[in-house]
Regions:
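Short, low-complexity disordered leader/linker segments with a strong preference
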Residues: 1-28, 319-321
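C-terminal capping/gating helix-and-loop segments adjacent to ligand/active sites or protein-protein/ligand interfaces
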Residues: 274, 278-294, 316-321
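N-terminal (or domain-start) structured segment
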Residues: 23-112, 158-161, 171-202, 207, ...
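Hinge/capping helix and adjacent helix->loop/strand transition within the periplasmic-binding protein
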Residues: 28-29, 49-57, 76-85, 100-188, ...
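Extracellular/periplasmic bilobal clamshell ligand-binding domains
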Residues: 295-321
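Residue-level signal for short, function-critical loop segments
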Residues: 35-37, 156, 223, 259
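C-terminal lobe and pocket-closing loops
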Residues: 207-276, 281, 302, 306-309
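Solvent-exposed coil/turn segments that connect beta secondary-structure elements
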Residues: 92-94, 121, 131, 206, ...
Length: 321
């Protein structure tokens, strides 16, 4: 509670300072990120908030990160009503994983929100301890066949990363060898292979880049339909082209259900304009190793259902590892 109060004070202070330079007619919208303040979503949210005065005279985005995942969103839903100037992030982790694996943690459903926009798309990658010389799908198959046990670092025991690892190794026929090793953040999990704590890791590309460049890890594959085409990981194989399951990580920007349609449309336009900015796109691609990925509500629902199908199929591997 203290963290939320302090976060709210900071958000209001930031909004006031921004409004001083933008005119009193602008309304501040607090954007709650329920994950680590140093994480990918929080960083993109801060960037979008800083750019919002350039694209709207009536709305200012104020980034507020409160680590807590489902608990943070529970509080947000309880404290927010239709037309409140509040937004929150959620993704497949909550709507497709927590809803099936730990439903008691969720005091909300998708119907409690109205979709505004998707903030970004992230293609997770699997990395390996460099000493293992695993540099592609064929190398991974050979390693899995010979190893008595395979440890994979992930951000949380039942996270998106955990299910991606389970779906790949499980679909290869080695789910019984999988040992998921959960860490408290995605960045920490990404560094586990370099420290020799695990054989493999699943992470955002940006979180393993430095370790890869320093020779501490190899990149095994990308959880996407095709190979990565740009950046430091260009040429890394996409698991989808081999028929293995995958999904991208998305970050949905949501308002409270019942919020006026014209307000939601204005918010969507603001985010779309920010994400179309050339500087933002360059930063997303080159610094964060993310993609602009505008979505419709139908796209969101299809994404959630795809992830749910993977969770249902590989649930026993994850919870039993």
């Amino acid at each position: 509670m203290k963290k939320r109060i302090w976060g709210s004070i900071l958000a209001v202070a930031t909004a006031v300072s921004m409004l001083d330079g933008c005119g009193s007619s602008a309304t501040s919208w607090t954007v709650t990120c329920p994950w680590a303040p140093s994480g990918v979503a929080a960083m993109v949210s801060q960037k979008a908030a800083a750019m919002s005065p350039d694209y709207s005279d009536s709305m200012i985005l104020v980034a507020d990160a409160i680590k807590g995942d489902a608990a943070t969103v529970n509080t947000w839903v309880a404290d927010t009503k239709a037309d409140d100037t509040e937004l929150v992030f959620a993704g497949e982790g909550l709507f497709a994983i927590t809803s099936l694996v730990d439903p008691e943690k969720m005091q909300f459903t998708y119907d409690d929100f109205v979709f505004v926009e998707n903030l970004y798309s992230s293609i997770f990658v699997m990395s390996a301890d460099a000493k293992l010389n695993i540099a592609g799908i064929d190398d991974l198959k050979t390693f899995l066949a010979d190893a008595p046990e395979v440890s994979v670092a992930v951000n949380g025991a039942t996270s998106s990363e955990a299910f991606l690892a389970a779906s790949l190794i499980g679909s290869m026929g080695y789910g019984d060898k999988l040992k998921l090793t959960p860490y408290s953040s995605a960045a920490e999990a990404a560094q586990a292979v370099a420290r020799g704590e695990t054989n493999l890791a699943v992470s955002h590309q940006s979180q393993i880049l430095e370790t890869y460049q320093q020779g501490g890890a190899t990149i095994v594959c990308a959880f996407d339909g095709e190979d990565i085409t740009d950046g430091a990981f260009a040429g890394v194989e996409g698991v989808g082209k081999y028929g293995y399951p995958y999904f991208r990580n998305r970050c949905f920007v949501l308002a409270r259900s019942g919020t006026k349609e014209e307000t939601v449309s204005e918010l969507k336009k603001l985010y779309d304009d920010i994400l179309a900015d050339e500087k933002m796109q360059t930063w997303l691609k080159d610094t964060m190793m993310l993609e602009e990925d505008l979505m419709t509500e139908q796209d969101v629902k299809e994404h959630i259902e795809n992830v749910k199908s993977i969770v249902n199929e590989y649930y026993e591997i994850v919870v039993g590892s």
